[in-house]
């Protein structure tokens, strides 16, 4: 029976991936693979194990197969492909793989790796690794691109890409450049500086304590011994945000919605967590939030179709996509063109994670298109006022369309074209074009 061959594209991808696994760039810092190689008498590792790694399963279309479940003909096809590499060694039976040369001392390798690696930022949370690699390939060969997760939330990209070049000289040459990616001027620094800053961020996050009455204090737990002080609303779910231009030369205002749109970046490999639509009811909670009138809903849908790809216009959907990484976003109180708004999470822990991530960010907030969202907690009397207004509005609206409210002219009773505090808790001013 003939052994099936990999397609040319799959063979190239598999070869590159396995070479990376055993490279000077990865092996010294890959604890699992390094331990497996060290424990092997001949320095070779089961090829079935390598094929069971998540990326390899994807390339080979193996689904959730484990090492013992990898088809033998697939292993043989991969072995034939890897035999063409000068960096890899394949056992005679084609079932094991390893480096063709010995690994240098770990300390020396890490020092060399750091010297030829550049830390570049800021990148959007949904940027693709392939796009970053393609961008830097314009300035020299790229060995690898790493995208470390955020200190405050492991599911979120930190915004810093670690780009490794073949030599220290190559890295130094790149850091002398003035580079702009997707409209953002990049800050370039040695990886050692990034490592030092990250260590400080980890300590800062470990010592981070939210303000009293904030995210991790549910339902008045700070007064748990005195029921008279316990509020009758959930605490720590609301945060406010202010949008500021992320580019140094920009203003704090959003551009007019009449400006032409820019081509957006491709979707990330990991899409933002699904979040409920802003116009859905929240069972057992304030329903006025989800009861936007038809005109407001049409306006938002029209804006989404027109400005989805415009990096200079922030929509509610953009905010839900960014903050949905931290938890379920129940409602976004924001109108296109405004500088400020409010977010309500389903759980206080999500609010806490979002604020912690913003505190640790070099920009002082979280990137939303071409803007930085600077976060503040809504606590104390401000939080009480928010819930009081929502609930009073809910009672008023239940006289309308079957509990979803009559024609109110927008969120929280805001009349169209009005941002006055008398009708809407969000007192933000509209930004003139």
From Swiss-Prot:
* Residue intervals of the xRRM domain: 298-419
Instruction: Write out the biased-composition intervals (Basic and acidic residues).
Output: 255-283, 299-310
Superkingdom in the source lineage: Eukaryota
Domain (HTH La-type RNA-binding) ranges? 4-108
Knockout mutant characteristics: Embryonic-lethal with deficient embryos arrested at early globular stage of development characterized by nucleolar hypertrophy.
**Which coarse location class applies to the principal site listed for this UniProt protein?**
nucleus
Compartmental location: Nucleus, Nucleoplasm; Nucleus, Nucleolus
**Disordered: region residues:** 206-233, 245-310, 395-433
Example of a GO cellular component annotation carried by this entry = ribonucleoprotein complex
Give start-end positions of Polar residues composition bias.
Answer: 208-219
| PANTHER family registered for this protein in UniProt | ACHILLES, ISOFORM A, LUPUS LA PROTEIN-RELATED
The protein in question is named: La protein 1
């Amino acid at each position: 029976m003939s052994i099936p061959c990999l397609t040319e594209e799959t063979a190239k991808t598999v070869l590159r991936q396995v070479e990376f696994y055993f490279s000077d760039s990865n092996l010294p810092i890959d604890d699992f693979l390094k331990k497996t190689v060290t424990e092997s008498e001949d320095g070779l590792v089961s090829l079935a194990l390598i094929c069971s790694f998540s990326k390899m399963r994807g390339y080979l279309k193996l689904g959730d197969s484990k090492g013992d479940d990898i088809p033998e003909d697939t292993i043989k096809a991969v072995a034939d492909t890897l035999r063409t590499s000068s960096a890899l060694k394949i056992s005679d039976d084609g079932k094991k793989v390893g480096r063709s040369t010995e690994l240098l001392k770990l300390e020396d390798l890490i020092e060399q790796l750091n010297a030829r690696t550049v830390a570049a930022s800021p990148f959007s949370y949904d940027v693709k690794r392939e796009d970053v690699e393609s961008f830097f390939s314009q300035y020299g060969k790229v060995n690898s691109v790493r995208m470390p997760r955020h200190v405050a939330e492991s599911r979120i990209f930190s915004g810093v890409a670690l780009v490794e070049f073949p030599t220290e000289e190559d890295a130094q040459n790149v850091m002398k450049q003035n580079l702009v990616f997707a409209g953002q001027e990049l800050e370039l620094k040695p990886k050692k500086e990034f490592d030092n800053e990250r260590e400080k961020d980890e300590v800062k996050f470990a010592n981070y304590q939210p303000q009293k009455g904030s995210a991790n204090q549910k339902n008045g737990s700070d007064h748990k011994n005195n029921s008279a002080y316990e509020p009758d609303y959930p605490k720590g779910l609301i945060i406010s945000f202010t949008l500021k231009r992320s580019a140094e030369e920009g203003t704090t205002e959003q551009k007019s919605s009449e400006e032409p749109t820019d081509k957006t970046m491709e979707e990330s490999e990991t899409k933002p967590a699904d979040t409920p639509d802003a116009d859905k009811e929240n069972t057992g909670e304030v329903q006025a939030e989800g009861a936007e009138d038809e005109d407001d809903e049409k306006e938002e849908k029209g804006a989404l179709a027109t400005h989805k790809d415009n990096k200079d216009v922030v929509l509610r959907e953009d905010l839900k996509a960014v903050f949905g990484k931290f938890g379920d976003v129940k409602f976004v109180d924001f109108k296109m063109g405004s500088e400020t708004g409010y977010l309500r999470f389903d759980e206080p822990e999500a609010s806490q994670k979002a604020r912690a991530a913003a505190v640790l960010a070099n920009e002082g907030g979280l990137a939303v298109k071409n803007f930085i969202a600077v976060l503040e907690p809504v606590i104390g009397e401000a939080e009480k006022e928010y819930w009081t207004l929502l609930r009073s509005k809910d009672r008023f609206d239940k006289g309308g369309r079957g509990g979803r409210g009559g024609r109110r002219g927008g969120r929280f009773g805001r009349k169209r074209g009005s941002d006055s505090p008398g009708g809407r808790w969000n007192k933000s001013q509209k930004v003139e074009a």
